[in-house]
Amino acid sequence: MKYKTALLTMVCTLCMSATMASPRDTARVEHLSMWNQLSAPLLGNPALHGATYDKSYSEMVLSVDCQHQSEAFVEEKGKGHVLGALAVNSYLRMNPRSAVWGSASYTTGKQKSICWNSTSDYELLAPYVMADTLGGDTHRERYTFSGGYGTQLGRVLLGGEMAIRAEHEYRDRDPRMRGIVTELLLRGGAGLMAWHYRWGVLAEGTIYKQTNSVDFYNELGVIPEYHMTGLGTEYGRFAGEQRSLAYRGGSFDIAFDAVPTGNEGLYGHVSLGRNAYERLLTSANSLPLSRLIYNKVETTMGWKQESKHHWAAYAHFAFTKRSGDENLIGKSDSQYYPVIGKLTMYKDYLMDASIGGMYGQQGGDRSWMVSLKAGYRNHRERYVYPERLLDRAHAYVKVAGEWMRPMSRRLSLSLGADAGHYARVSDNMVMPFANMTSKFAEMIRHKYRFVKASYTEAHLHARGDYHLKSSSIGLFAEVAGGMVLCSEREQQVGLRASVGVTF
């Protein structure tokens, strides 16, 4: 209830600030144009975010998002979802040197047919999740709040931002999983205007907590819960009755940015980060079972020019190394389990390199853009002993286009489309299937089938904005749909519909 009260308060506050908004069409194009994808890394630095847009723009949106897969591409994430959301986003230009922005959202719905995962935030915590062979649908509720401020003092740029996420995921039939997540993010940024550039530096940190448990109301239907350790392995000593976990951790990132203040020039972004998450068995006096560590590096460099025709070319590289430490647990004494050592057993390497470009026109209340991107992606997972390996590589190409234009004094239209293809280049698997149970072997074969597959995707979206007479308030409706075709003769379809208010 307290989250809903806070959400309503923020919505009302932002609506009261609507009188600060600038002309709708020009602001809409400035904030929503595809050209802004080039500036996406800069928005992470609140000092640069405060100088990114000239005009205020706010919107409140109610949406429904549906997705269905004929067979789960990733069993741990399920076969699809039905989610409804209410969100408000606002960027207010206070004066030529200062801006404030904020957002709030509430999302609720159902995740369908999850298997081999009883823990929330699978993508963040994998492979160290609790799992069973039955699974089922889960219900989700998520609240998010964020706010930031950026200002310019002479040639110095300063900014700060805070964001909070609270999430509850549960199942109302056996096995009754429950995950309660809280995450706090803090950002601080600084910048300098010099030599026709904005130079920025960012420091960012998160604090993460999750409590996770599984219960059975039918004593005759109890099945084991496994504490997974990667690539079909599990902590067998604590499987079965130990069904309460906690996750504690966080992250720290630094980033450096450079963007030209004029209409053309080189731009660049470099970020370094580290995440660490510890898994604790709360049903055994908070025994630490494992620790997952991320080390990340990402860089983008390109050239952009804004004139009658906008164009840009860039190169991007990202690398993430994840390693998992498993604790060696000694003999218990009165429910106390001593940790006598640790071994780094799980290793995961993900590399993505790409080049791309964008071309089009953007001015005032209209815009059109096309983009092309091509790259190579390699993902390698390894478990040290007994040796297990899952390696795959894909080459990909993506193309996208967007058209935004006023149709009359009150009606504006936006159309967009994108398509992509991920082609398998190589794959390799090493697994001791002779020593694996049939359920675990089936799970690994399913995973290998889809991670090595090739994929083709296409998406369309259309949005109409209607501006009320003699008012800065507008109404809009948007519909988007897409399809993903898998070379394993499976597919995914999705549809999203939204209505909202701009101010």
Could you describe each region identified by the protein language model?
Residues 491-503:
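Outer-membrane beta-barrel "beta-signal"
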Residues 93-97, 152-156, 193-197, 261-263, ...:
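Outer-membrane beta-barrel channels and translocator barrels
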Residues 86-88, 145-147, 186-188, 254-258, ...:
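Membrane-embedded beta-strands of outer-membrane beta-barrel proteins
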Residues 19-112:
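N-terminal, post-signal peptide beta-strand-biased segments of exported outer-membrane/organellar beta-barrel
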Residues 62-68, 106-110, 153-155, 164-168, ...:
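Transmembrane beta-strands of outer-membrane beta-barrel pores
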Residues 233-374:
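Long, internal scaffold/assembly segments composed of regular secondary structure
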Residues 56-62, 99-104, 156-162, 197-203, ...:
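Transmembrane beta-strands of outer-membrane beta-barrel proteins
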